[in-house]
Amino acid sequence: MAGTPARFDVLLTKGAEQDLEAIHDHISEFDCVANANHVLDALMAVVESLSTFPERGSYPKELVGLGIKEYRQTFFKPYRVIYRITGNQVIIYVIADGRRDMQSVLARRLLGA
């Protein structure tokens, strides 16, 4: 059908799944379960929205500074969802609080540093 956007399969790495669990646990412990559930639902909506037009995401500045433009990011403030488009798949690698030292997080998780 003309005008129908391409659909991508969205996959979460084990690390991204663990990120979601850690975010939920942290908010549950220091705030409340209802807010943790709200944030988790919102993050999952952001993740699922990448099934259409994932190219809309920006390049993480920490990686662009290293000349790396194969990863993109989208946001549910203050959280950053870092992903890569491979064929018809969107692979989520990192879901992290953007207030953290993202240079270290990205180096460790994406570059194996």
Task: Label each PLM-derived region with a short phrase.
Residues 76-80, 84-113:
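Enriched for short, Lys/Arg-rich terminal
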Residues 12-14, 44-45, 53-57:
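Alpha-helical transmembrane segments and membrane-interface helix-loop junctions
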Residues 10, 23, 27, 39, ...:
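Hydrophobic aliphatic residue packing
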Residues 1-42:
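Arg/Lys-rich, positively charged N-terminal/basic patches that mediate binding to nucleic acids
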Residues 19, 26, 42, 46-49, ...:
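Residue-level recognition of specific faces of alpha-helices
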Residues 37, 58, 99:
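Gly/Ser/Thr-rich helix-start
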Residues 32, 48, 52-56, 79, ...:
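Generic structural signal for secondary-structure transition and capping sites
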Residues 53-88:
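Basic/aromatic recognition patch in beta-strand/loop cores that engages polyanionic ligands
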